[in-house]
A protein has these predicted regions:
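Expand to "…catalyze enediolate/carbanion chemistry for C-C bond making/breaking, isomerization
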Residues: 1-198
């Protein structure tokens, strides 16, 4: 990851460069942040924190970034984006948005796969519709996260769609998120990139 950040021009055409680290409940998290930011911080725009559950998770990452930037003399201010992908995170989403805005927080992403597991929900496709549920089973959660983002000036990003062989359903999922007010959706397969860029213009 560090070598890729150093060697390739990821920031061309105004792209935001973000690195997903391990979650705070692992012993890898702090080394992820220290190594990536100390060695390639000038090429980085944000850190993506998975499984954010409380406002203190964002504060911890922000405090670590403060220390690294001060210690290394890094002039670039690195932002924070988070994944809401647990029931704890969704229960605290408004508080996280409110306090996180003062701690570098710029965006929230809906991590539907782990969120479904956290809810013990029955799903057929990651990010897709369930034929046993009338409508979109994630509508309430997406709306709740969106309100928190809009109330406190954060970007709202929808998460992945798992069936690479169903481009139509990916496109429909992206359009549903856009209709709610989401600013983007994950593209986790090359085919998604082409679909997303063409549909984003619509």
């Amino acid at each position: 990851v560090i070598q890729a950040l150093q060697d390739l021009d990821w920031q061309g055409n105004g792209k935001t460069v973000s690195v997903r680290i391990n979650s705070i409940d692992t012993h890898y998290m702090y080394r992820d942040v220290i190594e990536v930011v100390e060695q390639a911080g000038e090429h980085l725009d944000t850190i993506l924190l998975p499984k954010a559950g409380t406002a203190s998770d964002v504060y911890m990452l922000s405090a670590l970034l403060n220390q690294i930037e001060t210690s290394t003399g890094l002039k670039k201010h690195i932002g924070i984006e988070i994944l809401i992908e647990t029931t704890l995170g969704m229960a605290n989403v408004m508080d996280i948005a409110k306090s996180g805005r003062e701690e570098r927080l710029e965006a929230m992403h809906f991590g539907v796969a782990d969120y479904a597991a956290s809810c013990r929900a029955r799903t057929t496709v990651i990010g897709g519709l369930n034929p046993d549920y009338p409508g979109d089973q994630w509508h309430a959660d997406l709306s709740q996260m969106l309100v928190a983002c809009r109330a406190y000036g954060l970007r709202a990003i929808d998460g992945p769609f798992g069936d690479f062989k169903d481009p139509e359903s990916y496109t429909l999922a992206a359009k549903r998120a856009a209709a709610l007010g989401y600013e983007g959706k994950w593209a986790i397969h090359p085919s998604h990139c082409l679909l997303y860029t063409s549909d984003a213009a619509d």
